[in-house]
A protein has these predicted regions:
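Short regulatory/linker helices and ligand/cofactor-binding micro-motifs at input modules
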Residues: 8-26, 30, 34, 191-209, ...
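Regulatory sensory and allosteric helical modules in signal-transduction proteins
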Residues: 67-110, 114
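Heptad-repeat alpha-helical coiled-coil signal-transmission segments
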Residues: 1, 8, 167, 173, ...
Length: 224
């Protein structure tokens, strides 16, 4: 089987993972593993921004950390928090301009001057950044690391870009699912509270207190 067919097969498998899961954090490492089966950067990692806050990025991929994936409850942040200002300029460029940036040699590109010590320590030479975009907003980025022996073609970059789009879709699905679960939780709480208020209305006959309580519940559900 040719490498191109392997790529298409793995892309279909990644698409199926995304379609069948409502939790990106449960499948993120499997996605990266499938991607690296058919393209050969040394490793890849995913960083996320939470609530459109670009002051910090959260490293969430155990492929890079070589640790068990972190799983947090709804509403919690996932991953290792890193000051985004410490990232190389070309990563800021990729995020700001919403474009793929390929630095073939970090020791020759002035934009990578601040990461050269890390590159020596980790043993990589090149790096490619793929922004993760949801509804025209960058919600994170994936980076691929290359050593001197690694080769990567334009077709490989297109393939990784397709995977990045599927990762972004998975993040969007997860966000919508979490928002729905939060709303269900609020509705359940509101129903319980309204039932209690109804009992008080029956006993106290105080309609104003009851209406005030309904207003409070409506504000809580709508975040107003």
């Amino acid at each position: 089987m040719s490498n191109d067919i392997y790529k298409m097969r793995n892309l279909v498998e990644i698409s199926s993972m995304v379609a069948e899961s409502s939790d990106f954090f449960m499948i993120k490492d499997k996605i990266i593993e499938k991607m690296l089966e058919v393209v050969h950067p040394t490793k890849a990692c995913v960083n996320l921004f939470y609530k459109n806050n670009y002051k910090h990025a959260y490293l969430v991929c155990s492929q890079t950390l070589e640790k068990i994936p972190y799983l947090f409850p709804i509403g919690g942040t996932v991953g290792v928090k890193i000051d985004f200002s410490t990232y190389p300029k070309y990563i800021h460029e990729a995020v700001k301009e919403k474009k793929i940036v390929y630095v073939k040699n970090v020791f020759e590109d002035i934009r990578a001057i601040d990461e050269r010590e890390m590159a020596k320590s980790e043993g990589y030479v090149g790096r490619i950044v793929f922004p993760l975009i949801v509804n025209n907003i960058v919600v994170g980025f994936m980076t691929c690391f290359l050593v001197e022996e690694d080769t990567i073609s334009d077709y490989d970059i297109d393939f990784i870009s397709s995977v990045a789009s599927l990762i972004a879709l998975s993040i969007e699905i997860t966000t919508k699912n979490n928002n729905m679960q939060r709303l269900v939780h609020k509705l359940r709480g509101a129903i319980s509270s309204i039932n209690e208020a109804t009992k008080k209305l029956y006993h106290n006959k105080n309609i104003n207190e009851f209406l005030d309580h309904l207003s409070e519940q409506a504000c809580d559900i709508t975040n107003s």
